[in-house]
């Protein structure tokens, strides 16, 4: 299984699919299924029945669904462009994520 280099609260851009070009913040990363939940991306409508025991109203609800990791690229905070990520170790031995374009730490 491929390593997921995108973490929670990262800013990402969709590079393939119906939401291509949209930018959002990562809400959740699912390593088991290789999918990522992104804010305001891949929105679908669900028809929900009312449930009086939980005090839920029925109706049509819009919610986000996870996207496959390969359809996303992380956005570098310094060069503000979508980029690939590689790793480098600092002098203290800490593992850092590095932008491939500008060589700055993410």
UniProtKB/Swiss-Prot annotation:
GO terms for cellular component: ribonucleoprotein complex; ribosome. This is Large ribosomal subunit protein uL24. SMART domains: KOW. GO terms for molecular function: rRNA binding; structural constituent of ribosome. HAMAP family: Ribosomal_uL24_B (MF_01326_B). It comes from Lawsonia intracellularis (strain PHE/MN1-00). Gene3D superfamilies: 2.30.30.30. Part of the 50S ribosomal subunit. The keyword ATP-binding does not apply.
